[in-house]
Amino acid sequence: MKKLMALALVVSFNLKSEIYEIRDYTIEEEDFEAYVYWAENHFMPYGNARIEIIDFWVNRGDEAIVEGTNPMVSPNGQPNVTWVAKYKNREERDAFFANLDVDPEWEKVWSKHPNPDAYIHSNARFFKSIK
């Protein structure tokens, strides 16, 4: 019985092997609206055709709430762009990003970026669902 339960746990974990990537960007204020336009009209169509983008959010001015026993805000400020993608596993995610370097379609999308140097700060975090 113990072996059966252990096997069930292993199978259950493997069935939930998908990962969620949460990406946060702090985009230069003067480039922000042009970046949002690019994201909506160029990045999202490209990304949605290739990966499962859960959602893509932008902050247009609502102040963040930073709390805790030692709250710190980055000297770069709070992110003003966040998006979440779901992948089967880390390998699928890494393959997507590695392919950007060789994909002519991505080259077209990136060439329309208003300012590739507008990313003050970028952060990618990886999570598994416990739901």
How would you describe each model-predicted region?
Residues 3-13:
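Sec-dependent N-terminal signal peptides
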Residues 18-38, 131:
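Surface-exposed interaction/gating patches
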Residues 19-26, 64-101, 125:
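Short, well-ordered beta-strand segments in beta-rich or mixed alpha/beta enzyme
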Residues 32-51:
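Core segments of cupin and vicinal oxygen chelate
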Residues 37-41, 96-103:
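Short amphipathic alpha-helices in soluble, non-transmembrane regions
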Residues 43-47, 93, 106:
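Mature, secreted membrane-active peptide modules
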Residues 49-50, 88-91, 131:
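A short, structured loop/turn motif at beta-sheet edges
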Residues 52-78, 101, 105-131:
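Glycine-rich beta-strand-turn "strand-cap" elements at beta-sheet edges
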